[in-house]
Regions:
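Flexible, membrane-associating and regulatory peripheral segments of lipid-active enzymes
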Residues: 1-64
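Serine-dependent carboxylesterase/thioesterase catalytic core
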Residues: 50, 77, 93-143
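Residue-level signature of transmembrane alpha-helix interfaces in integral membrane proteins
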Residues: 16-22, 26, 66-67, 90, ...
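Active-site catalytic motif of lipid deacylating hydrolases and related acyltransferases
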Residues: 38-110
Length: 143
């Protein structure tokens, strides 16, 4: 009796494994199509600006898999590299310089910004008070 139960369990394990492999293959095919279509390519580069008390380092991945997926699908990604624990005015001044540096490096006219938490405040300040509004195509803030 036990061998029959084992065979039944093995059957369900194999059935589940085959379904998972098929699903993974389908997902990879979709990812390949997305990559070849470059669905995340934008006219302007994207600047990711983190929130307070974080740094853009390779030791801690603040943004998770978002930058990787955006780049894999055609986007050009940059990071703020600013001191987020500084005042909004000081952080905004750093971000202004970073934006001008990126525009110079890429030759782009403008930049798209995705900012989290205090990074959004820093960017809004830079846009409204430091005169770079004409260099920013979009600002998306997330909480």
């Amino acid at each position: 009796m036990i061998p029959i139960v084992n065979l039944i369990v093995l059957f369900f394990i194999l059935k589940t494994t085959i379904a998972e492999c098929q699903e993974e293959a389908k997902r990879e095919e979709i990812n390949e199509q997305r990559r070849s279509l470059k669905i995340c390519a934008t006219k302007y580069p994207i600047l990711l600006v983190h929130g307070v008390f974080f740094r853009d380092t390779q030791f801690f991945n603040y943004w998770g898999r978002i930058p990787y997926e955006l780049e894999a699908n055609g986007a050009t990604i940059f990071y703020g590299n600013h001191h987020s624990a500084s005042s909004v005015a000081d952080s905004a001044a750093e971000l202004k310089l970073r934006i001008l540096e990126i525009l110079s490096e890429t030759g782009a006219e403008k930049i798209n910004i995705i900012a989290h938490s205090k990074g959004g405040l820093d960017c809004r300040y830079a846009i409204s008070k430091l005169g770079i509004g004409d260099r920013v195509a979009s600002l998306t803030t997330i909480n």
